[in-house]
Regions:
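Key DNA-contact positions within bacterial/archaeal DNA-binding proteins
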Residues: 40, 96
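Short, hydrophobic-biased segments on the C-terminal half of alpha helices
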Residues: 46-47
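Extreme N-terminal segment that seeds HTH/winged-HTH DNA-binding domains in transcriptional regulators
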Residues: 1-36
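Basic, amphipathic "hinge/linker" alpha-helix immediately C-terminal to the N-terminal HTH DNA-binding motif
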Residues: 61-80
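A short, conserved structural fragment
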Residues: 50-58
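C-terminal regulatory/oligomerization modules of transcriptional regulators
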Residues: 106-139
Length: 139
């Protein structure tokens, strides 16, 4: 049986992933600001994520993704970028407008839909913003 992750946890994983990709150290207050959430809500969610082996918190309260959390975050980022690619290249929505639409789609895509959409789109290697697709090994 496939384990499911809530949309809230997916949001946290993706935001931590994005901040890490930008080379930023992630702490709860930065995450609260980025997610427009109360620090107490962020703390409670991070505790659940820690319990579920998705994140680690070191002594300086820096948040990092575990291997499990990183794998899930890669998958979420891939779904998001794939949705952006579809919206921009197939539906001709301007690249600067696709983010919020893709954000909604990323949570609704099943593994089968992701697989078939990637095939339909020719296995894109870059999102419309020029970022390599997560998990792609490029030459």
């Amino acid at each position: 049986m496939e384990e499911t992750t809530s949309e809230v946890v997916e949001e946290y994983l993706l935001e931590i992933y994005i901040l890490n990709q930008a080379g930023e150290k992630v702490k709860a207050n930065k995450l609260a600001t980025a997610l427009n959430s109360k620090p107490s809500t962020v703390f409670a969610t991070l505790q659940r994520m820690k319990r579920d082996d998705l994140v680690k918190l070191n002594r300086s309260k820096e948040i990092t993704l575990t291997a499990k959390g990183s794998g899930l975050a890669d998958n979420i980022a891939y779904r998001h970028n794939l949705a952006e690619y579809f919206l921009c290249n197939s539906l001709k929505i301007p690249w600067f407008e696709v983010h919020m639409h893709a954000h909604k789609l990323e949570h609704a895509m099943t593994p089968l839909v992701v697989e078939k959409l990637a095939e339909f789109l020719g296995q894109p290697q870059f999102c419309p913003h020029g970022t390599p697709m997560p998990g792609q090994s490029l030459p």
